[in-house]
């Protein structure tokens, strides 16, 4: 079940590969995510010391959050991947033009997971071309729907 999607990532990048990663979360973050108070549009993934971290994802704390814990909505969160996946991703990210972006947050067997994508940035004309394709698909569907009535 999807919790949050990063639609901006599909507009700004060509997604070449996808990986599912676990996230190290605190208790209040899990409660807030279950309540749907998460936004990953501004998030990105970095590699530090052969570990992956999610930066810029915003999890708004609930009003009933613990009094003794000071919630930080945009703290850096560690991503959990297998060692061979991390090595493969490090090799690809070091190539020019590749980056890692969070695509969505979802549940897998009750755990919150983050789907990350190995992405290559789109140029402005690529974005315009994608928009034209999307408009054409929409127009084609409208024509087909109108023709069946």
Swiss-Prot record:
Annotated compartments: Cytoplasm
Keywords: Cytoplasm, RNA-binding
Xref: Pfam families: SmpB
Residues covered by region (Disordered): 123-149
Molecular-function GO term, any one: RNA binding
InterPro entries reported for this sequence: SmpB, SsrA-bd_prot, SsrA-bd_prot_CS
Domain of life: Bacteria
GO CC annotations, alphabetized: cytosol
Family membership: Belongs to the SmpB family.
Function: Required for rescue of stalled ribosomes mediated by trans-translation. Binds to transfer-messenger RNA (tmRNA), required for stable association of tmRNA with ribosomes. tmRNA and SmpB together mimic tRNA shape, replacing the anticodon stem-loop with SmpB. tmRNA is encoded by the ssrA gene; the 2 termini fold to resemble tRNA(Ala) and it encodes a 'tag peptide', a short internal open reading frame. During trans-translation Ala-aminoacylated tmRNA acts like a tRNA, entering the A-site of stalled ribosomes, displacing the stalled mRNA.
HAMAP family: SmpB
Designated name of the protein: SsrA-binding protein
Source species: Cupriavidus taiwanensis (strain DSM 17343 / BCRC 17206 / CCUG 44338 / CIP 107171 / LMG 19424 / R1) (Ralstonia taiwanensis (strain LMG 19424))
Gene: smpB
